[in-house]
C-alpha cells in the first residue's frame, strides 16, 4: 500500500503535466517540471498526514527541496521530458489510460480530503491538465 501510493504520488503530477501539453512532454516548461517534483513532495506529506506510512529515504527525500536526491529527480524528469523514454513511460500511458488516471485522481482527492495539507503545486498542475 505504501509503495503503491508513494509511486502514484509521482505518477499523477506527471500525468497532469502530460495532459497540459497534450501528451507532448518536450513542451513542458522548466516550471512545470519543477512543479511535478514539488507536487510529489506535497503528496508524500499528504499521505503521511492521512496516516499512510511513507519511506522518507525512498520517497519524500527524493522530492524535498535542497537534497541531492531532489537534484537527481529534477534531472530525471528533464531527461524523461526530452526523450522517447518519457513518451513510453509517461505520455503513452497517461494519454491511453485516461479513465485509470481519473480514478486515481479521485481516490487521491478523497484521501486528501481527510487532511489539511496544502498542495499548491499539485493543485496548479491538476488545474492545468
Label the model's feature ranges.
Residues 2-27, 31-44:
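Active-site-proximal catalytic alpha-helix in oxidoreductases
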Residues 37, 41-129:
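NAD(P)-dependent Rossmann-like dehydrogenase/reductase catalytic/cofactor-binding core
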Amino acid at each position: 500500500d505504501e509503495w503503491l501510493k508513494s509511486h502514484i504520488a509521482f505518477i499523477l503530477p506527471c500525468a497532469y503535466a502530460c495532459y497540459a501539453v497534450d501528451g507532448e512532454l518536450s513542451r513542458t516548461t522548466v516550471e512545470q517540471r519543477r512543479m511535478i517534483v514539488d507536487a510529489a513532495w506535497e503528496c508524500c506529506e499528504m499521505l503521511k498526514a492521512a496516516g499512510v506510512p511513507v519511506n522518507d529515504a525512498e520517497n519524500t527525500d527524493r522530492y524535498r527541496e535542497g537534497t541531492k536526491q531532489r537534484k537527481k529527480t529534477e534531472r530525471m524528469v528533464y531527461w524523461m521530458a526530452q526523450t522517447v523514454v518519457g513518451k513510453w513511460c509517461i505520455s503513452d500511458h497517461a494519454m491511453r489510460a485516461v479513465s485509470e488516471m481519473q480514478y486515481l485522481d479521485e481516490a487521491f482527492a478523497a484521501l486528501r480530503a481527510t487532511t489539511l495539507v496544502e498542495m499548491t503545486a499539485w493543485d496548479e498542475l491538476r488545474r492545468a491538465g
